[in-house]
């Protein structure tokens, strides 16, 4: 560790804002999905309301956003080998979009609801990760 202290710059404030937005999106999406699944009538349905109308995986978008925010906040005080830590948000993005997370959930959803016209339209019109107005 080092004893480097610096005043928070515009980059740090941007990092804080991204972290707060990302955290809020992730928690809100998780809460919306939990509330949806808690209702018996939704037991075998997919969620397509709230943040889930904007993205098929808004919780992962929030997760990625908050880690980019942490990196921006930390960047001004990192040096040398510490800069390797900046790979973290890229790794989280890669992991969630290419390895686990989205690919696994999409395969499971396709198997479960792939024959549903509503699901086919939802998947066609709703971005996988980056939100877009429905």
Describe every region a protein language model picked out:
Residues 1-32, 37-134:
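Hydrophobic transmembrane alpha-helices
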